[in-house]
Design a protein with these regions (language model features):
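His/Asp/Glu-rich, glycine-adjacent segments
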Residues: 2-4, 13, 97-267, 383-386, ...
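Active-site-proximal N-terminal segment of extracellular/periplasmic enzymes that hydrolyze or transfer
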Residues: 5-73, 317-318
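Secreted, luminal/periplasmic, and some membrane-associated catalytic domains
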Residues: 6, 36-38, 59-62, 67, ...
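Conserved beta strand-loop-helix elements of the APE1-like EEP
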Residues: 94-98, 148, 468, 607-608, ...
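A long, amphipathic alpha-helix that forms part
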Residues: 231-232, 236, 259-301, 326-335, ...
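Active-site His/acidic residue clusters
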Residues: 245-279, 389-393, 496-497, 666-668
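Low-complexity, glycine/alanine/valine/leucine- and proline-rich hydrophobic stretches
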Residues: 448, 453-525
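N-terminal, active-site-proximal structural segment of metallo-dependent hydrolase catalytic domains
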Residues: 534-608, 613, 619-625, 668, ...
Length: 696
């Protein structure tokens, strides 16, 4: 009865949902017939390291994420980013299964000699095309927002590879548009207030930049860029994801950039960067609730980050010259002072909105080449740079030049590769070969030392890597070649330690000797959606029991009708699979009844879970049966199935039955009786005495 009341109010709430009405008003296509099928929402918090998240949780910056762990059985795991520790490499691995798809955020194409910058649409689209040829897109038939790649999504917006955001207004008439604006008036007011607040914060930062002697025009551009990314883009992405949940898309992926934006500018642990996490936390709450209330699909929500950030010092601030000028002096070539160093990604992200302000912000910041001269080219965006000398040198010459870059150029680490593919790291302590000397290079206490060493070899062997690979991070210092206080892409412990906040029953195998990485998440998503071999949609299996236990589950399924009023034995099977039980005792199952589409619910659930079962009908009706069942993966034998006693003279009460089975597990026989007692105390006592009698 309580479930029916809750279901009634849920239907009312769904009927009044703004997302549902907007979908109708704008005529957006829906996925039909998928109400009981599994769906997943992937939420990425760009640039948030596992330690920074724990700090934010401790300071109550992300109260909703805390609630998920305390009340919704979510678990927090460290997640290794891979190398380079940036978004293109992480999304290449997650979306397409390809590790180290790029050698840096900016590099030279070995085929045509062009400089590639992954924030540029043409470059991102070309790499995405290559990835799609090598691996299957994870986001097929779904949507993707605010990333580098679309992941094969049917719909994508605000991505570097697919700049587009007007699809939701396409085809809407004036009346629908007016209703849309009125219905979301509070949201617009809220966004306006946040924009004003963020402008105030950004202007304060602008003044500090001028005092520090920064360029007026460039500092002025940062003000609307940060506002657009931290507030406007976040709200647009949130709204689109909520609409997609109402439409029933099978997979929805969205990326919140605000923290990463502020962390680059002010540092990963700065108060400004952590302030953005409160807004992100609230946005996640809205998306999570929209997904859970969706009547179009049975959604699960996973939350993760792609990488962290290292607190860094700008190279030019530390050494009084740009990395381009330093390299030109080392290679004895003239340097054009008009060619400035590469900037970070902050300004360029504003163009992803495809708004006039984005094009204004971007004006003058694009570069056709980042080099001291045409002979020697340097690409250095973030703490990883590549040097392309344009001349062939012997191994001995390259080794001497690498040492000179470290000693005279004050670059913390330089990697070079010999003719046999051996990778060597040069720093102020000497020359080391990877992966054997990983501890000497990265420190014995690095949390991902083995994986970092292996991925560093892959990065340096990438066909587009330079003859010299520059790293601003070392065990002693963290530099970034652009002017930024937070950086990532290198092998540092903070920048390579992201996080994954997953439901405790997510089908993700937790490695025993390493951290999770994007490939593990990818396989978990594929299994959850039924795309992996042998998987069924929605399987959420615990694969990591620490000890051998007999896990028994009891579940009153209420004829497989949920609180949302949807009939779905398959959804019941998904719930059971969450807990990976050895034995399942089910009550209130329908078999052949018109009210539940005349299906055998026990058989459907058992078949879906690949279990054997026994069913006993407590009630025999003309239209079918109603009763209890026991399911198990182990050999199961029926011992007894019979009706229980009823109160004399109270034939109106629902008849009750019991089902006794014997289950063999690893040579031991376990006895189990499944029943559903009556509602009154007298009735329950009578039925309990019956089970304690000689017949049982």
């Amino acid at each position: 009865m309580i479930g029916r009341i809750e279901g009634f109010f849920l239907k009312i709430r769904r009927a009044l949902s703004r997302s549902e009405w907007i979908v109708r008003l704008l005529g957006l296509p829906r996925v039909k017939g998928a109400e009981s099928e599994a769906g997943i929402v992937l939420i990425q918090i760009d640039g948030l390291a596992h330690p920074q998240l724990k700090k934010a949780l401790k300071k109550h910056r992300m109260s909703f994420l805390n609630k998920l762990m305390q009340k919704e059985d979510y678990a927090l795991h460290p997640l290794y980013s891979g190398l380079p520790s940036n978004t293109p490499a992480f999304q290449g691995e997650l979306f397409y299964g390809i590790q180290t798809c790029v050698p840096a955020f900016s590099y030279q194409n070995s085929v045509n000699g062009e400089v590639i910058r992954m924030y540029e649409p043409e470059a991102a689209a070309a790499m995405q095309k290559h990835l799609a040829e090598e691996g299957e897109g994870l986001l097929q038939d779904g949507s993707s927002y605010s990333g580098i790649f679309s992941g094969g999504a049917m719909e994508s917006s605000f991505c570097a590879a697919t700049l587009n955001w007007r699809k939701n207004l396409h085809g809407a008439n004036a009346f629908s548009a007016a209703i849309f604006i009125l219905w979301n008036s509070w949201s617009f007011i809220r966004v306006a207030g946040l924009l004003i607040l963020e402008v105030g914060l950004a202007l304060g930062d602008f003044v500090r930049g001028l005092v520090a002697g920064q360029d007026l025009g460039k500092e002025l551009r940062f003000v609307p860029a940060r506002v657009a990314i931290s507030i406007l883009l976040r709200e647009l992405v949130t709204m689109n994801a909520m609409l997609d949940a109402a439409r029933g898309l099978p997979i929805i992926q969205l990326n919140f950039l605000g923290y990463d934006e502020q962390a680059h500018r002010r540092g990963p642990s700065s108060a400004f960067a952590h302030w953005t996490l409160k807004g992100i936390d609230h946005a996640i709450k809205r998306v999570w609730k929209a997904a859970k209330r969706s009547g179009a699909r049975d959604y699960e929500v996973w939350i993760y980050s792609d990488h962290g950030q290292e607190k860094s010092i700008p190279y030019e601030s530390a050494h009084g010259r740009s990395i381009e000028k330093a390299i030109s002096e080392i290679f004895d070539q003239p340097h054009d002072d008009k060619i400035s160093a590469e900037k970070g990604i902050q300004l360029q992200r504003a163009e992803w909105l495809s708004l006039p302000i984005g094009r204004w912000l971007f004006a003058g910041s694009k570069r056709t080449e980042t080099s001291p001269t045409p002979e020697t080219r340097v690409t250095a965006m973030g703490p990883v740079g590549h040097v392309y000398p344009g001349i062939v040198a012997t191994w001995e010459e390259r080794l001497l030049k690498a040492k000179e870059i470290v000693e005279k150029g004050k670059v913390p680490m330089v990697a070079i590769t010999d003719e046999n593919g051996g990778v060597y790291m040069i720093n102020d302590e000497g020359r080391f070969q990877l992966p054997v000397d990983a501890a000497a290079v990265f420190g014995i206490d690095h949390p991902h030392i083995k994986a970092v060493a292996q991925d560093m070899v892959k990065l340096c062997r990438h066909p587009d890597s330079g003859d010299y690979v520059l790293f601003g991070w070392s065990k002693k210092i963290s530099l970034s070649f652009p002017g930024e206080n937070g950086a990532h892409a290198g092998p540092g412990p903070a920048e390579t330690t992201a996080f994954a906040l997953l439901p405790g029953t997510a089908p993700v195998t937790l490695p025993t000797n390493r951290a999770l990485r994007a490939l593990d998440l990818r396989e978990g998503v594929r299994e959850f959606l039924g795309r992996a071999p042998g998987a069924f949609p929605g399987r959420r299996r615990q694969k990591n029991r620490k000890q051998k236990l007999l896990r028994v589950m009891t579940y009153n399924v209420h004829s497989c009708i949920g609180m949302d009023g949807k009939l779905s034995p398959e959804r019941i099977a998904r719930v059971i699979a969450q807990y990976d039980p050895d034995i399942v005792a089910l009550q209130e199952l329908d078999v052949g009844r018109r009210r539940t589409d005349a299906i055998d619910q026990a058989e459907v659930i058992a078949r879906t879970l690949e279990m054997d079962f026994h069913f006993h009908a407590a009630m025999q009706l003309e239209e079918g049966e109603y009763g209890n069942a026991v399911l198990s993966h182990h050999p199961i034998h029926l011992v007894r199935a019979a009706q229980l006693q009823r109160l004399p003279g109270r034939r109106i009460l629902e008849p009750r039955g019991a089902l006794w089975v014997r289950v063999e597990v690893e040579g031991l026989c376990h006895q189990l009786i499944n029943t559903h007692f009556g509602l009154s105390r007298r009735e329950r006592l009578l039925q309990c005495e019956d089970l304690l009698g000689p017949d049982w």
